[in-house]
Amino acid sequence: MGGAFSTSKPKPAAGEEGGESAVVAVHSKAKWDELWDAHKNTTKLVVIDFSASWCGPCKMMEPVFKEMAGRFTDVAFLKVDVDELAEVARTWRVEAMPTFVLARGGEEVGRIVGADKDELEKTINTLRSSSSSTATTT
């Protein structure tokens, strides 16, 4: 009796699933265009992870990026494979992986090249707090 309880998996904590923000992997130019069009005219911060499947530092940053997406639910997190979407990577002048581009209102507002978790988090926090003061309407 009780065996069903011992084999059941614990439910995720609040906010771990179904939140407004999660990493959205973009696998086509059409999907990129759709997502970019949805965000480029807003004040929402967008963090784009340009990576490659063969890139060791990119793999190291993947769980960090997912964890940040779970915490920063007011930020959009997109993941682009540079081999899959080379045209998008060229548009954003990506030359090394991982490259994290932070954008708001269709413009780049920050960039971190390399697997620098602390710098990425610091930059996201800085830009998140600056959006609350710049997001006021007249």
Curated annotation (Swiss-Prot):
Positions of the Thioredoxin domain: 12-129
Active site per UniProt: 55, 58
Keyword Disulfide bond: yes
Marked site: Deprotonates C-terminal active site Cys: 49
Cell compartment(s), UniProt: Cytoplasm
Record InterPro entries: Thioredoxin-like_sf (IPR036249), Thioredoxin_CS (IPR017937), Thioredoxin_domain (IPR013766), Thioredoxin_H-type-like (IPR050620)
PROSITE patterns, alphabetized: THIOREDOXIN_1, THIOREDOXIN_2
Keyword Disulfide bond: yes
Cited Pfam families: Thioredoxin (PF00085)
Disulfide linkage: 55-58
Family: Belongs to the thioredoxin family. Plant H-type subfamily.
Described function: Probable thiol-disulfide oxidoreductase that may be involved in the redox regulation of a number of cytosolic enzymes.
Protein name per the record: Thioredoxin H2-1
Native source species: Oryza sativa subsp. japonica
Lineage summary: Eukaryota, Viridiplantae, Streptophyta, Embryophyta, Tracheophyta
